[in-house]
Amino acid sequence: MTNLTLYQFRTSPFCAKVRKILDFKGLDYRVVEVDYLDRKDLLAASGQLIVPALTLESGETIADSDRIATVLDDLYPVPTIFPLEWRGIHLALARYFDGELEDALFRAALPDEIAHYARLGRGHAAFYRLIRERKYGAGFCDVTVRAHDAAMARAHDLLAPLDATLADRAFLLGRIGYADFALYGQLGYLAIGGDLKIPAEMENLRAWYGRVDRIRATLDPET
């Protein structure tokens, strides 16, 4: 039995990526939901304030989802998330998903994420807005919420080619790998409110999301 601890925010797409990789590899792990306002346990464990952070069996705690993924595949290589012949393509796709696509989906999901932190309390909501507006500029949250339709249209345009690609395959490159987990994490933005908001007409993408979501340790050959 492994002894791993994942420090996370539930709404983080990068934490969702790491959770699904751990599930795919069949690893036992404990989840610590970090309080957005009180990160002392995360700081004590990792020496920094960013999630995801993963404490390994050795006691070392590492941060950054890309680094965590690489270390996990080195320590627990079966099943691999980096099929040898496609490793570079998986890494390139993951960087795109965690960059341009992340920006689009984050903006599309911002109303749901604001509502999530509001449910946690006024202090959490205020601090969330402060962090976002320190990064993107004053008034960012309100402006982005008002532009929600445009944000959803941009997300739709970026997701449509992926839906088309998945028409004739179970996973992005045929065999499951790191890019699938990165995309899964980002699409978690569209489930923050509870209902999955991948457009209904994107049946291939919705089916793919379901396949990845059901992964625990080994992939059901029937899926």
PLM regions with names:
Residues 1-127:
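GST-like domain detector, emphasizing the conserved glutathione-binding G-site
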Residues 51, 78, 168-169, 184, ...:
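Alpha-helix C-caps/helix-loop-beta hinges
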Residues 99-207:
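GST-like fold's C-terminal all-alpha helical module
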Residues 206-214:
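Intrinsically disordered, low-complexity polar regions and short flexible loop motifs
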